[in-house]
A protein has these predicted regions:
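Membrane-interface extramembranous regions
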Residues: 2-135
Length: 135
């Protein structure tokens, strides 16, 4: 018979791995947001995209908010979901709009964000249930 120690240990390991992934994603998205705001080459890239510089700033703000949200218990699942949506847009832009686009990194970040969102889906459902108190 098992006393549940193995299951608790496995859950602890999964939780630690998720936190490490969230920290890594948060650090990358903060770096990416910094580049969006301050790297002159990003101005040219967003000119090539054709939607104007406002999209660069919106993307930077979303990435900053998502990076911070990844590190806040209770918001990490929602932040990961939001960042996954940003990476869907980034991947589509790299594939369909930019002439020499490379969607490899956005797709990797999309996958990692989806993994966090799936494993932290309890955060998402708790957040949604708070929005609809009548249920």
């Amino acid at each position: 018979m098992s006393d549940g120690t193995g299951t608790k240990g496995a859950l602890l390991i999964v939780n630690i791995v998720l936190w490490l992934l969230q920290i890594a994603l948060g650090a990358y998205f903060l770096y990416s947001a910094y580049m969006l705001f301050f790297e002159p080459g990003m101005v040219n890239k967003f000119n090539d995209i054709g939607f104007g510089q406002w999209l660069r700033y919106v993307t930077g703000v979303l990435e900053t908010a998502g990076a911070i949200g990844l590190l806040i218990p209770g918001l990490s699942g929602l932040a990961a979901l939001g960042l996954a949506l940003v990476m869907v847009g980034a991947s589509a832009t790299e594939i369909f709009i930019l002439a020499n686009g490379d969607a490899t990194l956005p797709l990797i970040l999309l996958l990692a964000s989806v993994v966090v969102a799936i494993f932290r889906r309890g955060d998402i459902t708790r957040f949604v249930s708070r929005l609809s108190p009548g249920r």
